[in-house]
Amino acid sequence: MCLAVGVGVRAPKHVPQIRRLGRAGRRLRCVTNCALGSCPIVTVQQPGRDFSSPREECGVFGVWAPGELVAKLTYFGLYALQHRGQEAAGIAVADGSQVLVFKDLGLVSQVFDEQTLAAMEGHVAIGHCRYSTTGDTTWENAQPVFRNIAAGSGVALGHNGNLVNTAELAARARDAGLIAKRCPAPATTDSDILGALLAHGAADSTLEQAALELLPTVRGAFCLTFMDENTLYACRDPYGVRPLSLGRLDRGWVVASETAGLDIVGASFVRDIEPGELLAIDADGVRSTRFANPTPKGCVFEYVYLARPDSTLAGRSVHGTRVEIGRRLARECPVEADLVIGVPESGTPAAVGYAQESGISYGQGLMKNAYVGRTFIQPSQTIRQLGIRLKLNPLKEVIRGKRLIVVDDSVVRGNTQRALVRMLREAGAVELHVRIASPPVKWPCFYGIDFPSPAELIANVVADEEEMLEAVRQGIGADTLGYISLRGMIAASEQPASRLCYACFDGRYPIELPSEAMLGKNVIEHMLANAARGAGLRDLAADQVPVDADENCVWR
């Protein structure tokens, strides 16, 4: 598919708050105890926040390793997964008798220090770095979430993904008395609902059995790590939308959203956790149980943009996939030029592949400020546009007087490409040929990526393909524009099309979407507001916002 025509800010360091749960008398500054009936939530008072970090999707990590510094291992694992979530970070550890949870808004390096990590002793830990898919960016919504099961027992949980039946699960929690009617809830995420239902089910059985009963009723994309005082659990939804891998340490086991998270702690890759599989790891080893039949639909955008290039997905190198996409893009959308440059970092491998295939020289035409986060995940449009200028700067001596092929990973809103084309022209480029290493993004994602409403997607302006391409080209100001085909992108992944989700490109969603449920980021906030007005959760269906509606349905 090719058209040719003639012409982050560092968050302030918050005062850290430790929640020690599982032993009476160990809770700090309890200010409310209002939300979950027999499973009380203890909220530590939060300092004032002024948070504007960039966003990505979440990363989860877990380790079971007696005799190891599990909190530090988890810290390093989260460091490797920082690109997946930059709003908040947290770690939970357990030593066989209690669970300790520490979390705050900010990057992993902002939330944790040596003193904090040294105080978190145990043999099992989970960690989470957050990008919000459901619920606002608040301290309460940081993870891991914690719920009491019984006196001296509890469960901590971290979640990567996004559920599509949150309203249904919240109604079930409400019917069980797990959601307060009028008192503001300390957390408003689908992850919090899962934690509440899991703890509620474990009150009358084991945590493992409660999970096996709950998970088949959960719909959407989810990779979970959760734990009690002794055991680490990890599971993946039946479609395997998001990645999750198992690794081996000399004295234990590790799970991580990406294999790069295993590498950083010296764990050897064992295998991917299968779709529909629950793992339990304790002193008896690793137990595997199927809670649903697998129907693999891995997110193809993980290959294009989300995952680290040094990770592998379903046995395929992410870096290798991106280079191959670039080669195919060169064959599908050739153009005469003097130099190929990539938009760092995720556009660089595809640019290398394009240069290799086309025979046109590759050069570094853009410098990236490593301390500014990704742009399509910034919390507001104004900051997105500012962030592009902050993060990229052209090397004028490299590009002046040249015809450039500029390779980027994707076009969502078009802000990056529009600002980039303007900068490169000002720096002296005589022609700008933009090539995109993914097809046009035309549909929102309901499974955990920050794609906006259809009206905000630049490729969704018109239905006709050629008119759309011309509209996007004009919108970003390029001389020519070319996208790789859907077929070419899938072929580069070396995965069968039947095992991938590419709904953001073709609108075919593998996981059934509820016809009436509000799928927006603030679905739980809306439900609580309805309850405050006297409307019951069972009345919510009549008050839902339709799937193609207004700004309340921010597509996540």
Curated annotation (Swiss-Prot):
GO terms for biological process: 'de novo' IMP biosynthetic process; purine nucleobase biosynthetic process. [4Fe-4S] cluster binds at residues 299, 445, 501, 504. Its EC number is 2.4.2.14. The active site is at 58 (nucleophile). Mg(2+) binds at residues 346, 408-409. Keywords: 4Fe-4S, Glutamine amidotransferase, Glycosyltransferase, Iron, Iron-sulfur, Magnesium, Metal-binding, Purine biosynthesis, Transferase. Its cofactor is Mg(2+); [4Fe-4S] cluster. InterPro entries: GATase_2_dom, Ntn_hydrolases_N, PRibTrfase_dom, PRTase-like, PurF, PurF_N. Residues 1-57 form a propeptide. Disulfide bonds: none annotated. Pathway: Purine metabolism; IMP biosynthesis via de novo pathway; N(1)-(5-phospho-D-ribosyl)glycinamide from 5-phospho-alpha-D-ribose 1-diphosphate: step 1/2. Pfam families: GATase_6. Binds 1 Mg(2+) ion per subunit. Residues 58-284 form the Glutamine amidotransferase type-2 domain. It catalyses: 5-phospho-beta-D-ribosylamine + L-glutamate + diphosphate = 5-phospho-alpha-D-ribose 1-diphosphate + L-glutamine + H2O. CDD domains: GPATase_N (cd00715), PRTases_typeI (cd06223). Transmembrane segments: none annotated. GO terms for molecular function: 4 iron, 4 sulfur cluster binding; amidophosphoribosyltransferase activity; magnesium ion binding. HAMAP family: PurF (MF_01931). In the C-terminal section; belongs to the purine/pyrimidine phosphoribosyltransferase family. This is Amidophosphoribosyltransferase. It comes from Mycobacterium leprae (strain TN). The lineage of its organism: Bacteria, Bacillati, Actinomycetota, Actinomycetes, Mycobacteriales.
